[in-house]
């Protein structure tokens, strides 16, 4: 609907999302890290693979203006604990109208590894992604890229990650979400 007319060479893709924290909460987190590290962050990588590889997806790397680069392992950092406990989700995420099995795109993409319900033969230390064709164009694309990548067909039941068929649920102890967190512009 957005593009008004159909484009034959356009493929659309959507991403299965865990939830999104507010820009204000992220800005507050960056300020906290700057104070703790006594410096100014120039970059933060929340999925750093440089020190421990792909098997440790929750390694954080902080690059600072003075040239320091620091690594914090796993979920020991405040951000990871809050994010994965669903304590900083935007309320709109819990009502997301796009989170359902009737996807509007040609292809749906998701992280698909380290899932307790995943078939053991699909596990890989390099990670596994879900590529789900939703249209004929999506099926053609998957057939076209099948050669250079390793693909396995799975049942629809196998694809039912918690965030695919329905929005994430709110944490029962989630604090009231600050009103200004919705409108706060993100800062570098």
Give the location of each predicted region.
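A short alpha->loop->secondary-structure connector
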Residues: 3-15
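Gly/Ser/Thr-rich loops at beta-strand to alpha-helix junctions
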Residues: 1, 19-21, 51
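Active-site adenylate/phosphate-handling loop in enzymes that bind or generate adenylated species
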Residues: 15-16, 115
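Long, compositionally biased charged/polar accessory segments in the mid-to-C-terminal portions
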Residues: 34, 39-188
């Amino acid at each position: 609907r957005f593009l008004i007319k159909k484009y034959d060479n356009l493929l659309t893709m959507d991403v299965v999302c865990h939830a999104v924290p507010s820009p204000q909460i992220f800005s507050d987190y960056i300020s906290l890290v700057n104070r703790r590290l006594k410096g100014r962050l120039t970059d933060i990588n929340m999925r750093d693979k440089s020190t421990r590889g792909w098997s440790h997806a929750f390694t954080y790397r902080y690059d600072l203006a003075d040239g320091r680069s620091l690594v914090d392992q796993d979920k020991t950092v405040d951000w990871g604990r809050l994010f994965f406990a669903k304590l900083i989700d935007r309320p709109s995420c819990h009502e997301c109208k796009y989170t359902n099995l009737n996807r509007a795109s040609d292809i749906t993409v998701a992280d698909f590894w380290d899932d307790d319900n995943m078939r053991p033969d699909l596990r890989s230390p390099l990670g596994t992604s879900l590529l789900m064709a939703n249209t004929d164009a999506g099926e053609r694309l998957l057939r076209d890229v099948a050669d250079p990548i390793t693909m396995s067909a799975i049942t629809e039941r196998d694809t039912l990650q918690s965030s695919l068929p329905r929005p994430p649920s709110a944490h029962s102890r989630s604090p009231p979400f600050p009103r200004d967190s919705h409108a706060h512009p993100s800062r570098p």
